[in-house]
Amino acid sequence: MDKTLRETIKDIVKNHLNSGKGNCYGQCLTAVGWVGGTLPELYEEDGMIELPMADVAGGAIVTGAALAGDRPIYVVRYQGFQWYNAVSIINYAAKCKEMWGTTAPIFVRSISMNGGVGPVAGSSHHSIYYRMPGLKILSPMTPKEYIYAYETFMNDDEPYYISEHRKSYDNKEELENIINDTADFTIFPISITRLEMKKLINLCDSENIKINIIHQLWIKPFIPKDEWITSLKNSKFGGIVTDDDYEDGCIGSIANKLSIASNKTVYTLGLEPRTAGFHSNVDNLPPDAEKIINFLKVIKNG
């Protein structure tokens, strides 16, 4: 039976600890739920290190561990906490190789969550890391993608920001690109918006809108393939990049790169430019299939 993404992550962490490759650090790791069931039931003597509830200190501790020869997995239970966790990772771990020839490889498991989690904790925040040199960013939404991300990290010497989303943890399916000879739009979905694509295809079929879908695993470095650019050039109304982060962030940069390479208009659709509240009436959620198709219809109909 195929494993879920949740089970895949749990197996990776367990093997990482049991094989002596490194420790796992974070807050409330061994609390009820074991971070959404993505951690094995291991404890400090096994390498599961509980950090104090001081978010700024956590990033510094794992940076120090990496400099000392550990290859830490750092679990950040809500991506919004990266405003505190990122300081030492960005300003030391990501820069030390270029400046001093030392390395600090850290596997940052940064977990996004949407719906009623308020103005700080919710949504994805990979744009915080995106503009800084010396690190890589991936957003795996499938089991094979996560295995690839981990194995790539283990063969590298830089910090990796792994942008996860809790709503993907039950996923067992791999996500395949759909590229037609001609289309109205080419969609470049990132993070949890990728799991809206199956529903979006059905909605587009009912509205006679033809789309290409090119799933995005790598956020940084973003290197567009020739096939993607050809797909954009063959799309009547251009493309759109969707994400669970604000539009004034990495998706704006990615859309610009795609637009320059293809000479086509590439739009962005992410979080609205406002603060999320706890109540559903004031929440700020990533674009779902309905919101995406409404956006496409506005463009198509002029």
Q: Where are the predicted features?
A:
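Thiamine diphosphate
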Residues: M1-P159, S163, H165-G302, ...
